[in-house]
Amino acid sequence: MPRAPTRPLVRWHGGKWRLAPWIIEHMPPHRVYVEPFGGGGSVLLRKPRVYAEVYNDLDAEIVNFFRVLRDPLLRADLIEACRLTPYARDEFDLAYEPTDDLLERARRTCVRAAMGFGSAGATKATTGFR
């Protein structure tokens, strides 16, 4: 059984990490769970698993991030790439440049989320460097 996350996977505008325990406590029993505006997936990742769970989001960058995490080899590569990313304005600026490489897109999403001022940094919205 996978371990429950102890921190949000990615800072996301409107993220429910702190509210997730309260939200989960007030959920009725269910077999199907749908996250229509998935974002960082804080509630989905913290709630007990059920028969069917659906994650959806219009933002292709965050959807790509979760696709990369789903693949064990890519997940390990993403973790390593993030560990080796220096906390620098140049990296932050580079994170807004387009790339076709799925792993690099996921890393850049993480960089924008971690280094951007405000949680909107994970999106393509331009934010300040923190």
Where are these regions (language model features)?
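Class I S-adenosyl-L-methionine-dependent methyltransferase module
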Residues: 49-130
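S-adenosyl-L-methionine
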Residues: 1-38, 42-43, 48
